Amino acid sequence: MTSLRALQLSCVLIICGVTMAASASETATGPEQGVWQKHEYSFQFLGFTTTYSCDGLASKLKVLLIAAGARADAKSTSGACSRGYGTPDKFARAYLKFYTLSAVGTADNASPPISGTWRSVALADRSPRELRLGDCELVEQFRDKVLPMFTTRNIDNRMTCVPNQLSGSVINLKFEVFAKFM
């Protein structure tokens, strides 16, 4: 009876060891080759809770682009707004021009390959520090419209945005992005 239990325990430990080694190899990958892909997008924000000026929207979007793994030279400029510079506008718009890293086999770009790696990203209230709970709907729209332009995996979306109120809203978006190896 004791030898049967010892055999069962040995089998369980071997299976656990193989499983742990397999999962560790999936998450701990070394540098891979990637190329920069250019993206240009006209982003129009439509939300209920927060109203941005066009320059304020452009500023928040640049923070989100860099946090999500865009190249450091990402540009976010204010679009044509009916109310002018610094004034909240219900239809704020920004123009985005940025580069994301794509795996060599998936990109149709002639730029020289560079080393990339998978990096964990977590967007939450005050992470990055410029992000506030009132930005919940903006993060939702960024997730839906801009994040698909990035090479991502393991997206964990636990966003809850309650229109017209901060109470009950939660910014919680986690994912892995293919970004420049540092």
What are these regions (language model features)?
Residues 54-58, 62-65, 139-143:
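Extracytoplasmic/secreted envelope proteins and their assembly/folding machinery
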Residues 73-105, 176:
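Short, intrinsically disordered low-complexity segments
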Residues 21-28:
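Boundary at the C-terminal end of the N-terminal hydrophobic targeting segment
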Residues 62-70, 147, 151:
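Sec-exported extracytoplasmic/periplasmic mature domains
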Residues 1-11:
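Bacterial N-terminal signal peptides that target proteins for export
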